[in-house]
């Protein structure tokens, strides 16, 4: 039987690169009943040991990423927009107009760029850099370096 609740939990928990603690906690809690030993190293990797029935057989290693790409708030403009930079490798061509959830208080926003009627002709066809994009949000409860 497939555990869709676990899959949903792992897919919806925040785990931006450098802040994977929530993902790590879920994984450890899920594998505890099956493990003989669980350790985390200085990089946050989970190392699990399970004794086999036959020591002569081959060893098995499972490896997977816990982190996900995201953004970090770098500035709040005087008119209240959030400036941000990428955390991980995100293609700038696909983020405009996307909804985002920012910070521990889960503030909702939308990624935007200077309106077309205020843009120069070369800006209208170029892919904007992250420094030219902003997040428009519903209310402010954020600080610089918030992850989201």
What does each model-identified segment do?
Residues 1-140, 146:
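N-terminal hydrophobic/helix-forming segments and targeting peptides
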């Amino acid at each position: 039987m497939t555990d869709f609740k676990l899959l949903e939990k792992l897919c919806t928990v925040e785990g931006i690169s450098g802040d994977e603690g929530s993902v790590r906690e879920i994984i450890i809690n899920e594998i505890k009943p099956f493990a003989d030993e669980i350790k985390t190293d200085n990089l946050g990797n989970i190392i699990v040991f399970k004794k086999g029935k036959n020591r002569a057989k081959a060893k098995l290693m499972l490896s997977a990423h816990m982190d996900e790409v995201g953004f970090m708030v770098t500035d709040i403009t005087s008119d209240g927009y959030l400036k941000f930079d990428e955390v991980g490798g995100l293609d700038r061509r696909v983020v405009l107009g996307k909804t985002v959830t920012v910070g521990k208080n889960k503030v909702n926003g939308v990624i935007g760029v200077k309106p077309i009627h205020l843009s120069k002709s070369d800006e209208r066809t170029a892919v904007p850099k992250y420094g030219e994009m902003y997040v428009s949000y519903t209310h402010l409860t954020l600080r610089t370096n918030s992850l989201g």
